[in-house]
């Protein structure tokens, strides 16, 4: 039997591929159209396991684009390799193929109360946000990410559900 140290087990766990955006806090079970945890739409949460790779990639890409928009408005990642090193050293899971701004979100989401110097992680806050505490900034990131996801749903998804329901009612 092979024995691994705790550090090696954490390393293996942190580098397992992330197969779903789920963060374990699904609010769609309570009727939300957009999950407050992972920001997927209710039908994406329900149908995820039936999606093919292209459908899953489309969801991942939308989530990435919205999150990057939120993050770039408040901070700059100036050293991607340092950020990656810090994530790996702290066993924080991240999607390697995503933008470093998504990585920054993962780091801040998990370490906002412990991080004292963002520059040590390859990031810096933009001037208008330098007086914010990281836990408040983390909450602002999450709130804006949710609001953008909700707006996207209302603009592009809800009208098609309404149209489909009306067409079925006429059938």
Protein language model features and the residues they cover:
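Generic detector of well-ordered alpha-helical segments enriched in charged/polar residues
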Residues: 19, 23, 57-64, 84, ...
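C-terminal, charged low-complexity interaction regions
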Residues: 115-171
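N-terminal cysteine/histidine-rich coordination modules
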Residues: 2-76
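Intrinsic disorder/low-structure terminal segments
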Residues: 3, 10-11, 93, 128, ...
């Amino acid at each position: 039997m092979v024995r691994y140290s705790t550090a090696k087990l954490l390393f293996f766990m942190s580098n397992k591929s992330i197969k779903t955006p789920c963060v374990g806090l699904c609010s769609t079970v309570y009727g939300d159209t957009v999950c407050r945890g992972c920001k997927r739409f209710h039908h994406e949460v329900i149908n995820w396991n039936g999606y093919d790779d292209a459908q899953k990639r489309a969801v991942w890409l939308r989530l990435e684009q919205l999150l990057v928009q939120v993050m770039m408005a408040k901070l700059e990642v100036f050293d991607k390799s340092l950020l990656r090193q810090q994530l790996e050293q702290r066993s924080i899971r991240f999607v390697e193929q995503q933008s470093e701004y998504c990585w920054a979100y993962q780091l801040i989401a998990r370490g906002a109360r412990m991080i004292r110097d963002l520059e040590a992680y390859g990031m810096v806050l933009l001037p208008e946000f330098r007086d914010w505490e990281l836990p408040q900034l983390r909450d602002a990131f999450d709130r804006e990410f949710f609001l953008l996801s909700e707006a996207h749903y209302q603009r592009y998804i809800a009208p098609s559900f309404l149209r489909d329901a009306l067409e079925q009612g006429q059938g």
